[in-house]
Amino acid sequence: MAKPDLSVEISGIKLRNPVMTASGTFGYGKEFSDYLDLEKIGAIITKGLSLRPKAGNPTPRIVETPGGMLNAIGLQNVGIDAFIGEKLPFLRTVDTPVIVNLYGNTLEEYGELAEKLDRLPEVAGLEVNISCPNVKQGGIVFGTDPNAAAEVVGLVRRSTSKPLIIKLSPNVTDVVRMADACVNAGADALSLINTLTGMAIDLQKRRPILANITGGLSGPAIKPVALRMVWQVSQAMAVPIIGIGGIMSATDALEFMLAGATAVQVGTANFLDPSAAQTIAAGIEDYLAKNGISDVKELIGALKI
Amino acid sequence: MAKPDLSVEISGIKLRNPVMTASGTFGYGKEFSDYLDLEKIGAIITKGLSLRPKAGNPTPRIVETPGGMLNAIGLQNVGIDAFIGEKLPFLRTVDTPVIVNLYGNTLEEYGELAEKLDRLPEVAGLEVNISCPNVKQGGIVFGTDPNAAAEVVGLVRRSTSKPLIIKLSPNVTDVVRMADACVNAGADALSLINTLTGMAIDLQKRRPILANITGGLSGPAIKPVALRMVWQVSQAMAVPIIGIGGIMSATDALEFMLAGATAVQVGTANFLDPSAAQTIAAGIEDYLAKNGISDVKELIGALKI
Amino acid sequence: MQFKSMVISNVEVSPAYFRMRMTAPPAIVEAIPGQFVMVRVRDAIDPLLRRPFGIFDLGTFPTEYTDCGRQTFCEILYKVVGKGTEMLSSLHHGDHLDILAPLGKGFAVGDPADEKILVGGGVGLAPLYYLAKELAKNSRVRLFAGGRNKEDILCITEFERLGVETYVSTDDGTLGASGLVTEVLEKHLAEDTGRKSLFACGPFPMLKAVAGIAGRHDLECQVSLEAYMACGVGACLGCVIKGKNHSDQTPDFRCVCKDGPVFFYQDLKWD
Amino acid sequence: MQFKSMVISNVEVSPAYFRMRMTAPPAIVEAIPGQFVMVRVRDAIDPLLRRPFGIFDLGTFPTEYTDCGRQTFCEILYKVVGKGTEMLSSLHHGDHLDILAPLGKGFAVGDPADEKILVGGGVGLAPLYYLAKELAKNSRVRLFAGGRNKEDILCITEFERLGVETYVSTDDGTLGASGLVTEVLEKHLAEDTGRKSLFACGPFPMLKAVAGIAGRHDLECQVSLEAYMACGVGACLGCVIKGKNHSDQTPDFRCVCKDGPVFFYQDLKWD
Ligand SMILES: Cc1cc2nc3c(=O)[nH]c(=O)nc-3n(C[C@H](O)[C@H](O)[C@H](O)COP(=O)(O)OP(=O)(O)OC[C@H]3O[C@@H](n4cnc5c(N)ncnc54)[C@H](O)[C@@H]3O)c2cc1C
Ligand SMILES: Cc1cc2nc3c(=O)[nH]c(=O)nc-3n(C[C@H](O)[C@H](O)[C@H](O)COP(=O)(O)OP(=O)(O)OC[C@H]3O[C@@H](n4cnc5c(N)ncnc54)[C@H](O)[C@@H]3O)c2cc1C
Ligand SMILES: Cc1cc2nc3c(=O)[nH]c(=O)nc-3n(C[C@H](O)[C@H](O)[C@H](O)COP(=O)(O)O)c2cc1C
Ligand SMILES: Cc1cc2nc3c(=O)[nH]c(=O)nc-3n(C[C@H](O)[C@H](O)[C@H](O)COP(=O)(O)O)c2cc1C
Ligand code: FES
Ligand code: FES
């Protein structure tokens, strides 16, 4: 049999395979370049970027929980100027699409940042984080209120002609309503899910373990919630979906595709295994070959009910 | 040092210790009587009861997920009459408070059931499930809309003078709003959390594993979310809270108490270890003794921020 | 009962099939054939739930050879199919387990005068060995053992040592007769029309076929079922199966863990 | 690099302290003292994250005694404090691990003419052994080892075999001088005012005290820090610590995993 076709497309971004790296878990790609071949994965999604450099939260910022971890990095990042000066030059040398994850503390910042990124030819698309639970000034509101979300999406849409992906929060009653609001406001694709808000406590010290008190839960623990949300949204509307949440293996990735995802992102798994994204992409190829499936796109939304 | 005081009180229900068994994971108590001493735990909460016997969902109804499990039992239960005839006689012989978990398919059923239970002297209190994600006819709506929740709670409140506990769903944007609505409508105490809605997929069969497609996620995986919600509600209002979600050990239980819970429920842990509830209660006693704490109530909400 | 157990031995008896012997309290000898154990593979959350296995054998070490008094043990025979069994297969002598046993309802022995026909598909053979040991004391016992290929045919010598007459078949003909075990059984029943009762354990389609055979030949027949289980004690209602009176209006669900795993075939709904 | 490793030995050297030797690829010998490894304890999700450990020693088996060519190995010295280290301690010869190594920035050796003062608190001693081995080749080395009690004093003989002069102290006086290791160090520095540089690893309060001493005596001083880590490669920003220029307005966070774990004390903010 011929080699199976692993390529997929997200609103014009052509990916050699459906496996991307999730924002905040893969730095700016370079950090992992000793451990995998960056040209064997579908796309690199960079750490959440803001207009100005951001210090993030005090430490501890991470803690392991059963089957998962909490993080409250607080979106520490170098800011757009240092990103262009220090991070893009390396990424330019890698023949893999770079999608920039971004967020703003205010509505205006989202717009301004999108405008700046629109001018960078190296940036294949934007992934807008309206769902980070750690930043009180905005994230949480935009991500849980359909009207506020629509407002951000609309503004960013007017600020860029690049493919526009909106990353949704799972901390909502009705993810389909949020998805709907974003698509109506101009989103080309949706990433789901971001982290679930959680908390961990140190009994002996009688204190929250994270300096930020609460943090975002990621890892295998959240996979069932993520799969459910991907499936709900894919049932409700025809928009390309990027599935995220606890993906550790090719099997996990393919389950998300059956549920309706066109591509997936690997997050926490990068910490367990820095070559995870490549291993998962190779595992998908293996699975297709073994099962006589010539094109991975056949699996998208192929769940039988 | 004298033996530490483990007793707590939930709206008039006196518990010898804060460890109860969660509804649906402990049958009607008898199933576990070979494995632990039912008179060494705080209270028994029985399987979700409805007015009429209920068949529940087709199988498979359960599946293991990373650090947790999904269930879609669909509230199979014997109905109030068989409960009184077949289950209560055994429970009457056990010197431990029995709290009945109940749900209705309609608003009226909630009221009718509460009225019937109100007449049973063996029943120490009612725990109303407005949060079960498996039954389409009602559960999900009551549990995620503050107005609908207030309506149920108000009706049940008028139908019983027994202590009234409302069990909240975590599948909401703002759990504090739900809590507030329930307390204003007459709830004496709140149980949180019920299960998170999730899904699991069989890649090879290309089908959801659960016959019901989605199910409720429980177990250690959800503990961080549960702790966060207990803490949020306890910060926002002064109502007794029963903490539930992934409690496996005395340490877990005490963390929930620090976050603001007056008592806890042990669910999935009963499957890993049928003596879990007793072991956890004993572990709490040990912890208090070792740390020179004379009364467990000192720990309720004692988290330092 | 719940007890801590130590692995005594854990041997691969056929590719991917392991036979594990572990210590158990003396009361284990009261277990009835067909009852099962729930094993907590690790004191960690991965895997989370216990795994159920039929009791393959029970016994007591002769005191002459040990200094520890009369140590009782039980055995399981399992196939590596996923995470839990994979981890089990890597355990060594001296490793620890946490066990619930004996669980569920076992096989009813029935009239000793009846000939006993045991039908095992693949690892479904596991609970039939302990059963055969009991039955062979008073009755004539035959075993029909089937599998997809020769690797799935387990411990036949052990059955033969009990005096059991064995009939082996494989789907691919790599061992014994070629074809389904139920075809071989049906052929045998056509020739031998004496009084007999059936005891079957294996995949659901096989059990369904056996139930059909029992119906056509009007034989007493007990089947041992599998189901996903969480609690193992009848509390979670995760493992239910439709009882004979089941309809959407008159639900009749039975717990495989508590009302079973062994059922008389007439008590179930086979659709 | 990332590699599969096999446990060679895993020995309890003091109550709750284990020394584990494991196979590593030949390139491991390029590791610089102070660099660390991230160990995936189990191929399962419990524990989920890798655990970081300093490199205690490196080496190569002499070919005369093995048939496998020149097998390189590395060693860690660890204390059982929680789930991950508990599981590590139960591993045996032949068990498998997945390792990232060498990670981070190690100690700068500095001027060989300087006397080298190593300060270790408890298991903070671990990375100092490999450091002492390198330093002792060209410099005079002294070790100040402190702990809460005698169980926390590890592998002193090993250091002495390298020709290192050792000074032991315990908080409770059960071994060596009574008191904090930094008190003993301070006393020594008051008497001996030759050129020297400090290398410290241990709990944060100890490192802070050492940094204070270095400042007062104007000595070059490197400290090796600990932090909760997820990625170990500078990507997750979970392990950050405040750099010297840090303020809320001008954030200056350094990654312990990538910019450290070894820092010159002046590069950090010690509030
Ligand atoms: C009463 C009873 C007795 C059993 N006796 C034996 C026995 O003697 N020997 C033996 O090898 N097996 C027996 N089984 C099946 C055994 O429990 C499963 O094979 C085992 O739990 C799989 O665990 P795992 O973690 O390796 O597989 P998982 O990773 O959990 O799953 C792998 C695959 O195994 C199947 N499976 C998982 N759990 C079950 C289950 N509870 N029942 C049926 N299929 C399942 C599923 O198809 C799944 O896709 C018995 C099951 C029951 C209910
Ligand atoms: C660069 C570096 C080098 C290290 N070198 C060594 C070494 O050589 N020998 C050694 O014994 N230990 C070393 N540690 C500490 C070691 O990583 C932790 O003790 C270990 O990860 C604990 O894992 P656990 O699962 O047993 O504990 P857990 O169950 O995760 O936690 C138990 C307790 O240990 C502490 N702890 C957990 N993780 C860390 C961590 N990453 N850093 C600091 N404290 C932690 C916490 O206080 C926690 O309460 C090092 C840490 C770092 C960052
Ligand atoms: C340490 C860490 C940092 C993260 N930072 C970001 C971020 O900057 N922007 C963002 O949109 N998501 C961020 N996330 C969320 C991930 O991109 C991903 O949505 C989430 O972790 C779920 O996937 P996983 O279970 O595979 O990790 C972060 C997650 C982790 C663990
Ligand atoms: C098999 C199963 C059945 C359940 N049935 C009920 C129920 O009938 N009513 C209810 O309110 N909650 C039910 N629950 C939810 C539990 O009571 C509990 O809220 C949840 O499992 C979280 O706790 P845990 O993580 O300790 O299991 C059920 C949970 C499980 C696993
Ligand atoms: S496994 Fe829980 S009822 Fe059978
Ligand atoms: S551990 Fe991830 S940045 Fe240091």
Swiss-Prot record, chains A, B:
MF-aspect GO terms: dihydroorotate dehydrogenase (NAD+) activity
Keyword set, alphabetical order: Cytoplasm, Flavoprotein, FMN, NAD, Oxidoreductase, Pyrimidine biosynthesis
EC class name: oxidoreductase
Top-rank taxon: Bacteria
Keyword Oxidoreductase among record annotations: yes
Keyword presence, Metal-binding: no
Pathway: Pyrimidine metabolism; UMP biosynthesis via de novo pathway; orotate from (S)-dihydroorotate (NAD(+) route): step 1/1
Reactions listed under catalytic activity: (S)-dihydroorotate + NAD(+) = orotate + NADH + H(+)
PROSITE patterns: DHODEHASE_1 (PS00911), DHODEHASE_2 (PS00912)
Active-site residues from the entry: 132
Bound cofactor: record note: Binds 1 FMN per subunit.
Family: Belongs to the dihydroorotate dehydrogenase family. Type 1 subfamily.
Protein's recorded name: Dihydroorotate dehydrogenase B (NAD(+)), catalytic subunit
Species, as recorded: Geotalea daltonii (strain DSM 22248 / JCM 15807 / FRC-32)
